[in-house]
Amino acid sequence: MKNRKIIIGSRGSKLALIYAEKAREKILKHSKDFGIEEVIIKEIVTKGDQVQDKRLSEVGGKGLFSKTIEVELLEKKIDIAVHALKDMPSEETKGLLTDCFLERNDPREILISKDNKHLKDLASNSIIGTSSYRREFQIKKIRDDLNCKLIRGNVDTRIRKLKENLYDAIILSYAGIDSLGLNQNISQTFSTSEIIPCAGQGVIALQCRDNDESLIELLKQVDHQSTHISIKAERNVLKVLEGDCETAVGAFANIEGSKINLEVELFSLDGSKRFYLKSSESVDKAEKLGIEMGKTLKKMSNNSYKK
């Protein structure tokens, strides 16, 4: 790979470019060992960026944010794709490999509200902006007297809509707010047990072609092992459930010493039923744990989460 120039493909949002730059810095640390002369970032507009007024499930699902970038990777217009793992479908695209993950950012969910109120203090019938069924049902579990309304757009756009009184509060991921330096807006931070994050939340994934041996070896050096183990467990739950954008499922794993803890919840399609599991296993059985818990959830739910 002597004197090779590496092109990283990324969405063009402010947050996506922060993540891409973080990936670039990690790659540059190993560039000399692999004969890489230059690493540049290419901005790519995805369909998910273009369609801002509908749920992802209505316009193509999770792949809306990754598909366009993956096509450029397959066509060799870029060498590495940078994704927010939570936006990626559970099944790998043929010809590609996603096996490198940067150290996880804070996976928790946060509330930003008018007058800096906590969720418990919001007035009845307050309007909560959220982009996912999972968050909607999780909020309803805590406060069933609140109304959830779709909100799309980047973080700045969502905060602006809140300030324009279109919503009384919005739910976002801590990682995005923190990376953008907007922590001063946070009204409340939820623990991962109060609101279980989606699988892979807070994780940046690096993807390459599955036949690019030199880049595969480089990305092994960049990969964060404990993050890798945790998200494999979480993503296996999704794979077993064959989850899509309408699947309201939360999965969060954390490692404590030689043990991995996995907490999952699944809601029926209308959000009226909740199925919950928590279990631990030795770290070397993390992937198996995800599969087993996914199977148990599926059985408990009797497929009530599917259309």
Model-derived features: where do they sit?
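Short, well-ordered beta-strand segments
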Residues: 7-9, 42, 81, 99, ...
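Short, structured active-site "lid" loops
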Residues: 53-79
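Short glycine-rich anion-binding loops that position phosphate/pyrophosphate groups of nucleotides
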Residues: 85-88, 175-177
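Short, Asp-centered acidic motifs that coordinate Mg2+ and/or phosphate
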Residues: 78-82, 168-169
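A conserved helix-loop-strand patch within extracytoplasmic ligand-binding domains
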Residues: 85-86, 94-146
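Small-molecule-sensing regulatory modules
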Residues: 2-51, 58, 66, 141-307
